Curated annotation (Swiss-Prot):
It comes from the Bacteria. GO terms for molecular function: structural constituent of ribosome. The gene is rpmE2. One of its GO terms (biological process) is translation. Coiled coil: none annotated. This is Large ribosomal subunit protein bL31B.
Length: 85
């Protein structure tokens, strides 16, 4: 591998702000902010809006979406006009 062209791989502290959970994960993400972790060391810090800790797919809190199609919706709205025009 060529020297100097690959990003630096290091531990980064991610914070899911929606559920206030922290994750220490290896990443190549570049950030200027740092934060002290439970082990007393300072790590690069990045906030997240959503992660596996808060996403409905992973938490099991999925909504059931109606599978009714666009044609059925059209027929429901305008089906009564079928023979009148």
């Amino acid at each position: 591998m060529k020297e100097g062209i690959h990003p630096t791989y290091r531990k980064v502290l991610f914070h899911d702000t929606s559920v206030n959970k922290y994750f220490l994960i290896g990443s190549t993400l570049q950030t200027d902010r740092t934060m002290k972790w439970e082990d007393g060391k300072e790590y690069p810090y990045m906030t997240l809006d959503i992660s596996s800790e808060s996403h409905p797919f992973y938490t099991g809190e999925q909504r059931v979406v109606s599978t009714e199609g666009r044609v059925a919706n059209f027929n429901r709205r305008f089906g009564a006009l079928k023979g009148k025009v």
